């Protein structure tokens, strides 16, 4: 077992001093309608039956006409009291289950549980725990049969506790302070949300507060978080928290905290941990003790929000995170809950594609360009377009869905819960797993395909996985991950490797949740793995027989003029397409199910003045197909105004989106298929010769690409070389390979191979630019992504872009090579492990060597004439540098953002600063450099930031004040 302290004795005895009542009752004795027990009588004695029993001779029989069992009341239940109930049941039909209910008489608090805690033969133990959120006159506990079949209940056991203790405040406690006037505002939102039974957008406004840590106060903004009242119903309400300015909390700029019960206690943590080990993007997720305004709230689940820190922590380069806007869905759900007439609307079809961090994305030219491709890709995914390998990372999605299958999760696969990261290097979407609500009761082992079966039956295109299933490569990837994850050995190894983390979490949860069935939750994953194992054959059959499906087009009911329903997010959509000659082109689409007429607009300069259009733009009520119309309006236009026919002349304002409608972008552009002629037996071999390409060349659908010694490849007219398979270039000293751009426009030599091994020997890359067209922006003249690569006796010269050589997410060796005369950095490696030896880097306008999030050894290298840093390690890099010389740099060796550099036998000359250690990004900690070779110590100025450390021999220097690093740079 992964647990050491969550056994029965622990649960019942740990808080024995707080137990005020303990009841047990079987069906052995009754008097009239009462079951007679030692402590207290239970109702429903007339239903005593000798048909079956868990113990003894009798049980309580329930059916449709007599659905209750072992009913008992508790009076004067005070806020904070805990009632825990356990009841055994046996069903006449295995698919029918009993519930154990604990509730007040007014359904202010109604806790229902039908999850299995234990089984003994045909009997199942159900448990439920109720923690009073207010004072109650009466609380009832009972077994409930909500089916049409007979269900037998027996052996009820109930514990009532006066309270549960809170964890003690420690250095790791998240301590929040919200000023009184701000807390009052938050409380008003909480009250209104509870009244309406849904947390609408109006109740999610931010208030100001502080996080108190280590004697400092970090300013933050907070708001209520969640959609339904499960996030609000207890005193442990959910919050979204954003740190302000140049601050972070434990490496996080924004995050959420929520009651662990809303996230399945340990279940969701377990899935997040598997994702981390499988290199799948997911939010960082943990448990933390929380204090708000001096009151200990107890254990919360803390989950990272969708910031660039999420990506960098998982070894991804910053890129847009996108989603389908779900506001229309919640407006629809609110109407369905509160209005008498249930009329559906096209929430999915009308959903707009949005980035997280809208302002940052809009202001950054690079992020804006990347978003346009991300938007195009997500629109293709939304519309189930063919060839998904062109717009999503198929392997990542296969892994994502297999992990969700292991967790028996379908909630995260709903369209409105999906979040995608646009990888700016591969130009494809990757899924981000979060919000993993599990179905513990119905373990199937293949949730994906049951969900798809439902969609195929209805033939409605709302299950986005169908786009993936069309691709045979996805199906192969998916089956391989089912094979890996659907293994009991995999789960057992995971439990062993994470035993310490699991126990630490359980120790925190045990304070407030003494009856939490932790082992049941952990055993759940082993059961799910077994289910996956048992259904592998049916998966093979399903994939083999999978065929295309023709979808039924949804037809939506048009609103009668008398029906004043209006859902603003499922109505008029206005998008800024472009700006030219002082006028903006605005695209308009209508999804409101009534005729509308666009009448006017307003501008930033005259926000209170409506300017009438020369003629209105009219749309008929939406039923199945939208049409797009356009307006040309002044450059400072901000809103358009329209009148829905069914609202009696009411004028509605719609803000114009900063983002255009999705375009159909293929980043590869018009590419040549010339390499197909060189394909034989799964290998593409370019024979020795001279080649000139004027449009992109793409190598794919093969085992590997070989370029023979003596070949010469000229990339002109912005042509780029793109390979999605490993590359093998084995030039010789007498017959090297030349890859160059005679007109300096060639869009780089780019290799994307997630798992393969590439070899570059005796190859000269000269005069290349980087890929920068069709909104695809790379930084390297040579870009190598994923897998592993061995580079020997190569040169990277005269590049026309940011990096001479850029290696990303790869394991590499590079020896006897040269990087020279670069426009910016010489060699840039991100999220790599590697060894660089006996190489020369010279004449770089910026850093000679720049490593981020990497573990690198640098041995016997010569660096000269660097425009900024000779060697730079950042974002938690670990560098070992030995027998290396740096002659000419602003900073010889720099360690940034929690990086650790070990330096031995290094010669520094002509450097303005010998060493620098500093923190540049708030989510990281201080940096350090340790110089151990005393014979080669160099005296000179150093840059040392607050709490960063430089050790030279036995002398340790620690920064005492915060440096203005940007200012120091600007003064060079």
Where are the regions a protein language model picked out?
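Short strand-coil-strand connectors
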Residues: 105, 214-216, 293-295, 687, ...
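Extracellular beta-rich repeat passengers
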Residues: 93-95, 614-636, 641-643, 647-709, ...
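Extracellular and organelle-lumenal recognition/adhesion modules and their flexible linkers in secreted
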Residues: 6-164
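Short, surface-exposed charged micro-motifs
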Residues: 129, 221, 289, 419-421, ...
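Short edge-strand/loop segments of extracellular domains
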Residues: 102-109, 422-426, 725-732
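Short, solvent-exposed aromatic-acidic interface loops
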Residues: 146-147, 224-228, 435-439, 741-745, ...
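Sec-dependent bacterial lipoprotein signal peptides
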Residues: 1-3
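Phosphate/dinucleotide-binding and metal-coordinating scaffold of catalytic cores
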Residues: 6-12, 163-649
């Amino acid at each position: 077992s992964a647990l050491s302290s969550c056994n029965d004795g622990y649960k019942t005895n740990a808080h024995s001093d707080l137990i005020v009542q303990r009841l047990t009752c079987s069906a052995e004795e009754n008097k009239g309608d009462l079951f007679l027990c030692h402590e207290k009588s239970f109702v429903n004695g007339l239903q005593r039956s000798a048909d079956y029993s868990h113990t003894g001779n009798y049980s309580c029989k329930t059916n449709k006409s007599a659905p209750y069992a072992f009913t008992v009341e508790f009076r004067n239940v005070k806020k904070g009291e805990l009632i825990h109930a356990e009841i055994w049941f046996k069903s006449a039909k295995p698919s029918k289950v009993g519930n154990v209910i604990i509730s007040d008489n007014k359904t202010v608090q109604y806790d229902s549980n039908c999850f299995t805690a234990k089984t003994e033969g045909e009997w199942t133990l159900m448990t439920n725990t109720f923690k009073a959120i207010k004072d109650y006159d009466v609380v009832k506990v009972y077994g409930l049969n909500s089916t049409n079949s007979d269900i037998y209940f027996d052996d009820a056991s109930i514990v009532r506790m006066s309270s549960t203790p809170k964890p003690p405040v420690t250095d790791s406690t998240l301590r929040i302070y919200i000023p009184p006037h701000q807390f009052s505002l938050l409380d008003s939102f909480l009250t209104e949300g509870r009244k309406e039974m849904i947390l609408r957008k109006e109740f999610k406004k931010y208030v100001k507060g502080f996080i108190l840590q280590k004697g400092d106060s970090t300013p933050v903004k907070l708001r209520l978080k969640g959609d339904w009242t499960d996030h609000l119903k207890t005193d442990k309400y959910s919050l979204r928290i954003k740190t302000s300015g140049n601050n972070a909390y434990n490496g996080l700029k924004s995050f959420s905290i929520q009651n662990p019960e809303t996230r399945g206690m340990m279940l969701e943590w377990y899935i997040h941990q598997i994702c981390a080990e499988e290199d799948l993007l997911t939010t960082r997720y943990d448990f933390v003790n929380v204090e708000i305004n001096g009151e200990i709230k107890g254990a919360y689940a803390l989950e990272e929000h969708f910031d660039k820190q999420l990506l960098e922590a998982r070894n991804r380069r910053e890129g847009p995170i996108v989603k389908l806007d779900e506001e229309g869905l919640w407006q629809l759900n609110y109407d369905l809950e509160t209005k008498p007439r249930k009329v559906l609307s096209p929430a999915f079809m009308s959903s707009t594609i949005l980035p997280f961090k809208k302002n940052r994305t809009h202001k950054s030219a690079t992020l804006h360009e990347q978003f346009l491709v991300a938007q195009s890709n997500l629109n293709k995914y939304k519309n189930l377009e063919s060839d998904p390998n062109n717009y999503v990372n198929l392997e990542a999605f296969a892994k994502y869905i297999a992990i969700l299958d292991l967790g028996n999760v379908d909630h995260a696969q709903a369209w409105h819960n999906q979040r995608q990261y646009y990888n700016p290097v591969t130009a494809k979407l990757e899924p981000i797993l979060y919000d993993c609500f599990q179905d513990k009761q119905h373990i199937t082992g293949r949730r994906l395909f049951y969900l798809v079966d439902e969609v195929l039956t209805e033939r409605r295109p709302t299950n986005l996985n169908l786009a993936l299933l069309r691709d045979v490569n996805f199906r192969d990837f998916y089956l391989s991950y089912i094979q890996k994850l659907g293994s009991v050995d995999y789960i057992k190894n995971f439990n062993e490797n994470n035993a310490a983390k699991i126990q630490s979490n359980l120790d925190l949860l045990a304070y407030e949740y003494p009856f939490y069935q932790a082992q049941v939750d952990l055993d759940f994953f082993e059961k799910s793995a077994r289910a996956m194992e048992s259904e592998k054959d049916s998966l093979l059959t399903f994939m083999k027989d999978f065929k295309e499906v023709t979808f039924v087009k949804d037809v939506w009911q048009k609103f009668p003029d008398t029906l004043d329903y209006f859902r603003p997010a499922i109505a008029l959509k206005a998008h800024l397409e472009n700006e030219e000659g002082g006028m903006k082109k605005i695209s308009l689409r209508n999804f409101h199910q009534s005729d509308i007429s666009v009448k006017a607009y307003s501008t930033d300069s005259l926000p209170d003045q409506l300017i009438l259009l020369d003629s209105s733009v009219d749309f008929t009520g939406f039923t199945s197909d939208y049409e797009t119309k356009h307006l040309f309006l002044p450059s400072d236009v901000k809103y358009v105004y329209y009148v829905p026919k069914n609202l009696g002349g009411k004028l509605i304002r719609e803000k114009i989106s900063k983002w255009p409608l999705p375009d159909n972008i293929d980043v590869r552009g018009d590419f040549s298929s010339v390499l197909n002629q060189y394909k034989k037996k799964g290998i593409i071999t370019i024979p020795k010769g001279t080649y000139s390409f004027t449009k992109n060349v793409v190598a794919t659908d093969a085992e590997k690409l070989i370029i023979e010694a003596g070949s010469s490849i000229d990339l002109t007219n912005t042509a780029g070389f793109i390979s999605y398979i490993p590359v093998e270039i084995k030039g010789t000293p007498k017959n090297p390979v030349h890859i160059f751009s005679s007109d300096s426009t060639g869009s780089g030599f780019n290799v994307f191979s997630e798992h393969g091994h590439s070899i570059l020997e005796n190859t000269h890359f000269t005069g290349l630019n980087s890929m920068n067209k069709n909104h695809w922006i790379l930084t390297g003249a040579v870009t190598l992504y994923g897998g592993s690569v061995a580079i020997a006796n190569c040169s990277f010269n005269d590049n026309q872009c940011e990096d001479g050589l850029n290696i990303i997410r790869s394991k590499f060796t590079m020896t006897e090579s040269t990087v020279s005369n670069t426009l910016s950095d010489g060699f840039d490696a991100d999220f790599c492990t590697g060894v660089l030896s006996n190489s020369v880097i010279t004449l770089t306008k910026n850093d000679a060597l720049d490593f981020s999030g990497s573990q690198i050894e640098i041995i016997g290298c010569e660096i000269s004439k660097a425009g900024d840093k000779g060697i730079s390690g950042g974002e938690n890099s670990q560098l070992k540098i030995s027998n290396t010389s740096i002659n000419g740099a602003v900073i010889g060796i720099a360690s940034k953002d929690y990086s650790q550099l070990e330096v031995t036998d290094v010669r520094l000359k002509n450097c303005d600063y010998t060493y620098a250690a500093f923190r540049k990004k708030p989510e990281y900690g201080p940096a350090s450099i340790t110089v151990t070779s005393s014979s080669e110590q160099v005296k000179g100025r150093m840059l040392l930031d607050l709490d960063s450390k430089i050790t030279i021999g036995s002398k340790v220097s620690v920064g005492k004040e915060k440096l203005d690093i940007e200012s120091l740079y600007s003064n060079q």
